[in-house]
Amino acid sequence: MPLIPLRPLMEATIKYGFGQGAFNVNAVAQAKAAIEVHEMFRSPAILQGADLANGFMGGRTDFMNATLEDKKIGAKNIADAVKKYGADSEIPIVLHLDHGRDFDSCVAAISGGYTSVMIDGSSLPFDENVELTREVVKYAHARGVSVEGELGVLAGVEDHVFSASSTYTNPLKAVEFFRKIGRASCRERV
């Protein structure tokens, strides 16, 4: 079965009332194993490649310093592996970029074969996050790719980015965000 965008899978979770996990894969063997487990349970799969994993899979061992070219190569390598191991599968599979750091990272993932991307502008001021997310939505939707945006920040370290405090999402801001960017999947920290 070919890879699918995130949106139809999320619509099915609402319609049929089930939860859906998403699993980060940082190597070809992990992608293969994740698909096999989902096939055993006849469950749809959301496999995620983090922005940093794309750099690593592009051959950059010091992935924190991966170039855009490294990320492009890595995104294609991850997508090729997921397509290879999912080609004969009867389950729907989404390949999602987890915590894309900027527009170019999202473009690299989409060009590589990802069917869904997350643009994480949560560390930006609200209006800048809206503008960045809107730009990604416009680019991605023109190519049939789903988009997830993010508001709010949890304290701690996520994808090697540290935040000392949490900023929970104001539900009214979430509605405003959604309306300003257009149709997208928004992760809210509430």
Regions from the language model: what does each represent?
Residues I4-K15, V28-E90, G100-R189:
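Alpha/beta enzyme core
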